[in-house]
């Protein structure tokens, strides 16, 4: 890594997790000492010691003693954390998030339970917003079993999976799960295959419909992540997504429901970046002066690169179409968009047994 332009907004970055190193960084800065010898810390002028195989210390419990809870912005105290270290699938062609997590360290259910119980008791926090990339169900179920009598509410992020059965969702609900995030991304089998999204691409919609119905029956609010503008994606394939939302909206829209619409970006370090020709990418401007952080300007044989303003405008129109399907009360669309992807969304799902953005109520 030799791109100094990465440091336009910060002085240094931990390339791999190092809890003890973070503590040492604070001590060194406080004492006016150099930081260049801290493991896994990288800066333009001091390269440190990069250790890809360094395990992180799970026993570290966050300390929030310096937070003035009386001035807390949200109506209830919410702790943001994660249960797992990395995505258990880690095969999506568009994603580079796990490219710097080469060790498959598994989180300890026992330690996660201990952490949450400690924070719950010490800080009187009863809401936990877990931002996992994709939490394995075995870990989630073990955690749920350990905290089901703690009277806490929590959110979980995972993948669409046939292991998300009604029985599994019931156990999670009984342990306080209020919100489930799923990286749906698309529903067209060809696009899903190009994404390498799952090993059941042709059954994807059927499994998704079942998960949606079962989550709604368990009073669990949903949030989807969706990618538009994947190279070679056509309007017909985008319409397939719209038709899917129309088919499922009576189920998913009974509870507060939100979607994050992401415009595709070519990510440095992703399988797509390494095998560009396979995806019709004929040019990627990967010189250090051509991009900020990890999204790389590119061109495709389909003339659909998302750096093109006309392409962006067309994709934006599709986002409005999708939103129009999912939010029936049009006057509330700005509120729906502003709440999405925030703890306010989580709190809405915690307390609302109906969808205020639609006209449905649960039986």
Residue positions per predicted region:
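A structural motif corresponding to the C-terminal end of an alpha-helix
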Residues: 9, 122-123, 210-222, 248-254, ...
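Radical SAM enzyme core and accessory elements
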Residues: 289-363
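Glycine-rich beta-alpha loop elements in corrinoid/cobalamin-binding modules
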Residues: 1-51, 269
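Flexible glycine/acidic-rich beta-alpha junction loops that bind and position SAM and/or redox cofactors
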Residues: 1-3, 93, 190-195, 228-236, ...
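Radical SAM [4Fe-4S] cluster-binding motif and immediate context
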Residues: 62-218
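Structural recognition of alpha->loop->beta junctions
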Residues: 2-24, 174-180, 242-266
């Amino acid at each position: 890594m030799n791109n100094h332009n990465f440091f336009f907004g910060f002085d240094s970055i931990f390339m791999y997790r190092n809890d003890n190193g973070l503590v040492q960084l604070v001590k060194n800065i406080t004492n006016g000492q150099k930081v260049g010898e801290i493991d896994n810390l990288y800066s333009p002028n001091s390269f440190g010691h990069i250790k890809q195989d360094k395990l992180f210390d799970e026993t570290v419990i966050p300390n929030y003693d310096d937070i003035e809870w009386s001035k807390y912005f949200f109506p209830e105290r919410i702790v943001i954390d994660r249960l797992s270290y990395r995505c258990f699938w880690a095969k999506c062609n568009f994603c580079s998030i796990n490219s710097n997590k080469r060790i498959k360290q598994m989180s300890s259910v026992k330690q996660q339970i201990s952490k949450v119980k400690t924070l719950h008791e010490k800080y009187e926090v009863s809401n936990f917003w877990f931002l996992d990339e994709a939490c394995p169900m075995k870990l989630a179920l073990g955690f749920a079993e350990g905290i089901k009598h703690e009277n806490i509410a929590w959110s979980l992020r995972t993948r669409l999976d046939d292991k998300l059965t009604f029985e599994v969702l019931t156990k999670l609900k009984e342990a306080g799960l209020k919100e489930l995030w799923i990286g749906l991304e698309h529903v067209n089998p060809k696009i899903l295959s190009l994404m390498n999204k799952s090993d059941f691409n042709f059954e994807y919609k059927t499994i998704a419909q079942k998960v949606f119905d079962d989550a709604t029956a368990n009073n669990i609010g949903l949030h989807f992540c969706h990618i538009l503008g994947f190279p070679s994606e056509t309007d017909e394939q985008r319409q397939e997504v719209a038709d899917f939302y129309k088919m499922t909206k009576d189920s998913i829209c009974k509870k507060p429901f939100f979607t994050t619409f992401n415009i595709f970006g070519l990510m440095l370090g992703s399988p797509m970046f390494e095998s560009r020709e396979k995806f019709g990418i004929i040019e990627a401007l990967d010189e250090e002066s051509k991009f900020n952080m990890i999204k790389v300007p590119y061109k495709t044989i389909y003339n659909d690169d998302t750096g093109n303003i006309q392409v962006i405008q067309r994709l934006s129109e599709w986002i409005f179409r999708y939103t129009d399907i999912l939010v029936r009360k049009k006057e509330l669309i700005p509120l729906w968009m502003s709440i999405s992807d925030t703890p306010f969304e989580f709190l809405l799902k915690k307390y609302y047994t109906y969808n205020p953005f639609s006209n449905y109520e649960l039986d």
